Curated annotation (Swiss-Prot):
Binds 2 magnesium or manganese ions per subunit. This is D-alanine--D-alanine ligase. It is found in: Cytoplasm. ATP binds at residues 126-181. Belongs to the D-alanine--D-alanine ligase family. PROSITE patterns: ATP_GRASP (PS50975), DALA_DALA_LIGASE_1 (PS00843), DALA_DALA_LIGASE_2 (PS00844).
Amino acid sequence: MKVGIIMGGISSEREVSLNSGKSIINYMDKNKYEIVPIVIDKKNDVFEKVKDIDFAFIALHGKFGEDGIIQSVFQTMDIPYSGCSPLTSGICMDKDISKKLLYSANINTAEWICIKSIENIDYDYLEKMGYPVVVKPNSGGSSVATTIIEKSEDIEEAARLAFNYDEEVMIEKYIEGDEITCCILDGTALPILAIKPNKGSFFDYTSKYADGGSEEIVVEFEKPLQSKIEEISLKCWELFKCKGYVRVDMILKDKVPYVLELNTLPGLTKNSLFPKSANGVNISFTELLDKIIQCSM
C-alpha cells in the first residue's frame, strides 16, 4: 500500500508538521508500506501530489490540516486518510464551538468569552470572571500566541498578538492545576500522562517541542479519579464523533478534570505525547502508526 505522509502546510505550525512528518517516515514499517513524503507548500499542491497514493497519513497541524478542509479534499478524491471526519476536525479546531458542546454535555471546561475585535473585549465580564486569564487564537494550536494575563491593562496587547494568527480570539479563565492528557486510539483510552513544563509556566510552544522543554510521565491516579478522567475522555470521543486517534487535554484541579481541548491530529514527533502514552502499554511508535492506519481505513 502506498502511503503519502502529508506534511508542511500553510499554518503557523508548519515546522511542527515537518518534524511530525519526518518522525512518521522514520518509524513507519517500510516492509509493509511504500512511503511517499508529500510536502505541502500551498493549498493547490495537494491535488497534484496525492494522485497516486492509496492512503493519506495527515501530519499537518493548524489551518488546512486540522480544520477539516484537507479531510474534505481527500473525501472528494476518494482517498482514505488518518484521523477524524471533516466535521469533527472543524468543530474541534474551533475552541469556542468545542467549549459550547462540552458545556451542553455537562463536561467541565473553563469559563470563557470569544471576541472578534479589540472593541469586543468585555472588561466588566472579565472582571467578574476573575484574573488570571489565558488569551489565545480561537483556532490556533501548539500554544502559538497564547499568553497568561494577570491584569486587565495587559489584555489588549495579548489579544492583538493572538489576532495576528486568527480572526477570533478566546479569553479563558486560567485554572491553576496539573496538566494532564488522555490519548484515545480507536475508542480505547491509553495511559494518562501528566505534563510538567521545565521551560515556561505552562505547556507552551517551547515546552512542547524543545528538547527538555517538559517532562511527561505516565500516571495512575486512585481508581475513582482514574476512571473519571477516562470516562470524560471517552465521552468527548463520542460527543465529537471522533475516529482514529485523538488527544484530550485537561487541567486537574482539586481532583476535578476540566477539558481544555481535543486534538484531532496530535503531534507525532519524538517529543510528542501520543507515542509516549502508547509506549505505556508497550505499543511501539511503529505499531502505533500501523494501528492509526488500520483504524482509519
